[in-house]
């Protein structure tokens, strides 16, 4: 006896509900109405990011991305995608400001300047930490989930994706199952 599959229709399907999946969904929601996140873990758990410190390495406006990339190329012995790193660093300050707008608080000194910790022995690489320290990953997860909720991004947990559905060379969906019930799912 086979279970009748759950069938979901969406404009954009995001596989993975961690920080990257959440940001992908927020970006997709700027362009389409119906966005769905599926995750193998519990709904809204935040992936491994939820267990992080909630801190960020950010290229502040006074630095040039190419200078930070140069430091990272040295640090990683050249084994990094420099163009990708530069793009991430160029966007990092905007994401930092987005987090602050959503209510994530980064530590500041008495004069209001951001506090940072140098990273990896590099001159320009700075780590900006969540305040109060120690609960930042959980808080980041909460604010991302609140923003997803505000924008009506649908989220389903405990979904194991087993394959992608293709229409020619284009991916048009995914198939999997609900991990607790075993019910097949088609997206």
Please place each PLM-identified region on the residue numbering.
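N-terminal charge/polar-biased segments
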Residues: 1-9, 19, 154
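Conserved N-terminal/central alpha/beta ligand/cofactor-binding core
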Residues: 3-4, 40-180
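Core beta-strand elements of the Rossmann-like FAD/NAD(P) dinucleotide-binding domain
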Residues: 6-10, 180-187
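N-terminal Rossmann-like FAD-binding beta1-loop-alpha1 element of flavoenzymes
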Residues: 11-37
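Alpha-helix N-cap/helix-initiation motif
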Residues: 17-18, 133, 183-185
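Mobile, glycine-rich extracellular loop/lid and propeptide segments
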Residues: 19, 175, 187
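Conserved structured core elements
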Residues: 22, 93, 138, 186-187
């Amino acid at each position: 006896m086979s279970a009748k599959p759950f069938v979901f229709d969406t404009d954009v399907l995001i596989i993975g509900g961690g920080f990257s999946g959440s940001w992908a969904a927020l970006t997709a929601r700027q362009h389409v109405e119906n966005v769905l996140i599926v995750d193998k873990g519990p709904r809204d758990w935040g992936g491994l990011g939820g267990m992080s410190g909630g801190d960020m390495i950010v290229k502040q406006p006074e630095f040039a991305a190419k200078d930070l990339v140069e430091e990272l190329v040295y640090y990683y012995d050249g084994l990094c995608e420099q163009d990708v790193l530069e793009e991430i660093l160029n966007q990092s300050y905007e994401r930092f400001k987005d987090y602050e707008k959503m209510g994530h608080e980064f530590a500041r000194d008495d004069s209001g300047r951001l506090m940072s910790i140098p990273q990896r022995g590099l001159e320009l690489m700075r780590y900006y930490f969540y305040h109060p320290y120690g609960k930042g990953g959980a808080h980041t997860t909460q604010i991302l989930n609140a923003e997803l909720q505000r924008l009506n991004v649908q989220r389903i947990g405990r979904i194991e994706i087993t394959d992608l559905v293709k229409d020619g060379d284009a991916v048009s969906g995914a198939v999997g199952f609900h991990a607790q019930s075993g019910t097949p799912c088609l997206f």
